[in-house]
Amino acid sequence: SSIKKAKENEDIKGIYIQATSLGAGFASLEEIRNALKDFKESGKFVVAYGDAYTQGLYYLSSVADKVLLNPQGMLEWRGLAATPMFFKDLLEKVGVEMQVFKVGTYKSAVEPFISTEMSAANREQINVYLSSTWGQITSAVAESRNLSVEALNKEADRMLMFYPAEESVKNGLVDTLIYKNDVRDYLKNLAGIDKDDNMPILGIQDMINVKKNVPRDKSGNVIAVYYAYGEIDGGSSASTDEGINSEKVIKDLRKLKDNENVKAVVLRVNSPGGSAYGSEQIWYAVNQLKKEKPVIVSMGDYAASGGY
């Protein structure tokens, strides 16, 4: 990854996180955060700055050695919640009757169309999921910020978001209030660069051209990484380029199976599910691939239903 290459490159002194927006789920945020945590073992600095930290961005940024906030900025810290909507009464008013086929007590995807409230089973699984996720978030932030989980939960109970920025410093969530215009000088000081000297900064795209500090493998052997992202369709009946086209995935997996240079396959799955038929066909193709070489599955933000 870019973070790992930055860790190994002696010319790179640290990482600056400009916390503006990041469309990622908790699993992806956790992976990036762990990579940053590993980067810090090199002794290099990590600094985060934000005008408005969402809860997810703060979770990621809290791993930094220093967390900076604009004096007029804000930080969201208020826990997790699920707010499903139910459309049964609306559908009845417009004369629509849903025909539902489902298997399993906890298969709750259709509940908004056939119920007016959450079932006991769905409430149970959502509570377990949210409690587990929040527990991981608070434990990680508590460790990085040298705070207790109890203190973090107390702040969340206050629904912290629109409080003055000074509150975030007072309660230990933020280290320093600083205007964005002064951040560059702050970073120069950490990197040991004179205030009047130029400080080159590499973006993530620039890191693509930075070579890894590892010997080049000349054996010709390959570990393939195959990405399966999006909803799963049934194959030929679907014409969209988005999501997981089951027929294409099956062909690709067959090619990987037949390629003698590919010694193993990492299947990266980020999917909420979709077509039961398409999922079954992909499952069979993966099993055929397993007979020839090792297959490791890496699950992303979603690996639900057919994705699982």
For each of these PLM feature ranges, what is it?
Residues 158, 165-168, 177, 183-184:
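PDZ peptide-recognition modules
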